[in-house]
């Protein structure tokens, strides 16, 4: 009965190697499309976006989760790079900052043309696959980047933006963020305001993917019900496995299934295990769970590399994707399901968004009501019958009191 027991560890190693070998084989023909990577933000923080600084060389930069050798080792074939600007830029220089981050992404493609190919559509991703390059797309992380302007939304589209996260971790004047669900922020729009609905419709018209990572549950529900095209969660996980409000609850996963939408699983420990520590197997648990609830077509990868401080053991950087794919194969995912999670699910969603677009339709023109905007530096141009500067709440009352007092003194 115990004959050859000493061979068991060797058999286990061989089996593990076989899963990884199969993962590599699959990824050579179907590389990863990752939904969210914050390398551009890391380049701003470390080098003030100066890519020609020798220290910023992406072939040798080792202080980030992402560099060119790691991307190649991880079989990353397409990346939505995050054009991110923090919430404290809202009502200030968010548009300027966003354009600068888009510029960084485009300069990455110019500086490393042998590695990166900047693309703006699903066909471009497939072209990059054929050329053995990393298709590089722009995802703008946070609705504050459009400064409540459909004109800015369109301008960012023309600069290459192909998804917009409706909020980051702050409300916009037209959409609520996930902190509303924790009680840390107050709901302003009950999901989406009338202008927020106009943003969603204009994104549909243009062919911009709607990203619901970071939004409140009410905003998830409103956008999923309103959008004519599938949406994505570019870097979120399953709420049932980790009760963090950045994750997606089961009833929303059902809406994801009904609409053909996509959840690209985040690797941040706090969203994976709800603890400071996590491991690769727990990330696979989230992938398993979303597949069970929403279907194999609803699963993707959104690692959030270079945007988080803690990553699971076994997924320390972008080179580790083959190990995660090997774990899915070990869990008896079919090759078809794995190819879907790697790339085909995102390509399906992207193509559906493109097909739903209608550039012949008249663009949205209704501006957000001036009273819904904040910050005293806004001018009145285009808004009739208003002061030359948009006054903060209470300022109008103060002005009326001053006027009445002056009349009494006459």
Curated annotation (Swiss-Prot):
SUPFAM superfamilies: Metallo-dependent hydrolases
Membrane topology: Lipid-anchor; GPI-anchor
Keywords per UniProt: Cell membrane, Cell projection, Dipeptidase, Disulfide bond, Glycoprotein, GPI-anchor, Hydrolase, Lipid metabolism, Lipoprotein, Membrane, Metal-binding, Metalloprotease, Protease, Signal, Zinc
GO MF term (any one): dipeptidase activity
Propeptide residues per the UniProt entry: 385-410
Signal peptide: 1-16
Expression sites by tissue: Expressed in lung, kidney and intestinal tissues.
Means of activity regulation: Inhibited by L-penicillamine. Beta-lactamase activity is inhibited by cilastatin.
S-S bonds: 87-170, 242-274
Ranges that cross the membrane: none
UniProt binding sites for substrate: 168, 246, 304
One of the record's GO cellular component terms: plasma membrane
Residue numbers binding Zn(2+) 2: 141, 214, 235
CDD domains given in the database record: rDP_like
Binding site for Zn(2+) 1: 36, 38, 141
A GO biological process held by the record: proteolysis
E.C. number(s) listed in UniProt: 3.4.13.19, 3.5.2.6
Highest taxon of the lineage: Eukaryota
Lipid linkage positions (GPI-anchor amidated serine): 384
Compartment annotation: Apical cell membrane; Cell projection, Microvillus membrane
Job description of the protein: Hydrolyzes a wide range of dipeptides. Hydrolyzes the conversion of leukotriene D4 to leukotriene E4. Hydrolyzes cystinyl-bis-glycine (cys-bis-gly) formed during glutathione degradation. Also possesses beta lactamase activity and hydrolytically inactivates beta-lactam antibiotics.
Subunit note: Homodimer; disulfide-linked.
Similarity comment text for this entry: Belongs to the metallo-dependent hydrolases superfamily. Peptidase M19 family.
Protein name: Dipeptidase 1
Gene: DPEP1
């Amino acid at each position: 009965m115990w004959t050859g027991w000493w061979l068991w560890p060797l058999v286990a190693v061989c089996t593990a190697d076989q899963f990884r070998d199969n993962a590599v084989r699959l990824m050579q023909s179907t590389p990863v499309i990752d939904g969210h990577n914050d390398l551009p933000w890391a380049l701003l923080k470390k080098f003030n976006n100066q890519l020609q600084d020798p220290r910023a060389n992406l072939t040798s930069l080792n202080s980030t989760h992402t560099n060119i050798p790691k991307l190649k080792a991880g079989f990353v074939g397409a990346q939505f790079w995050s054009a991110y600007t923090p919430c404290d830029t809202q009502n200030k220089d968010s548009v300027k900052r966003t354009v600068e981050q888009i510029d960084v992404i485009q300069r990455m493609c110019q500086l490393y043309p042998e590695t990166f190919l900047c693309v703006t559509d699903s066909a471009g991703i497939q072209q990059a696959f054929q050329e053995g390059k990393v298709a590089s797309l722009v995802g703008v992380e946070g609705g504050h980047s459009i400064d409540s302007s459909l004109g800015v939304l369109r301008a960012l589209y023309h600069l290459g933006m192909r998804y917009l996260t409706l909020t980051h971790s702050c409300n916009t004047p037209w959409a609520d963020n996930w902190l509303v669900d924790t009680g840390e922020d107050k709901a302003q729009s009950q999901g989406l305001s009338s202008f927020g609905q106009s943003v969603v419709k204009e994104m549909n018209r243009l062919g911009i993917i709607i990203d619901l990572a970071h939004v409140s549950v009410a905003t998830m529900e409103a956008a999923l019900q309103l959008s004519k095209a599938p949406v994505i969660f570019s870097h979120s996980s399953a709420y049932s496995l980790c009760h963090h409000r950045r994750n997606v609850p089961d009833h929303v996963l059902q809406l994801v299934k009904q609409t053909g939408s996509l959840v690209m699983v985040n690797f941040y420990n706090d969203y994976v295990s709800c603890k400071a520590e996590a491991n690769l197997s727990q990330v696979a648990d989230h992938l398993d769970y979303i597949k069970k609830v929403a279907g194999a077509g609803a699963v993707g990868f959104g690692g959030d590399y270079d945007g988080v401080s803690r990553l699971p053991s076994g997924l320390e950087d972008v080179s580790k994707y083959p190990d995660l794919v090997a774990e899915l194969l070990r869990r008896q995912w079919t090759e078809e399901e794995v190819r879907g999670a790697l790339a085909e699910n995102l390509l399906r969603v992207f193509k559906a968004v493109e097909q739903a677009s209608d550039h012949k339709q008249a663009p949205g023109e209704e501006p957000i009501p001036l009273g819904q905007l904040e910050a005293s530096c806004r001018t009145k141009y285009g808004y009739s019958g208003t002061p030359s500067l948009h006054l903060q709440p209470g300022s109008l009352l103060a002005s009326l009191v001053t006027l009445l007092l002056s009349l009494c003194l006459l």
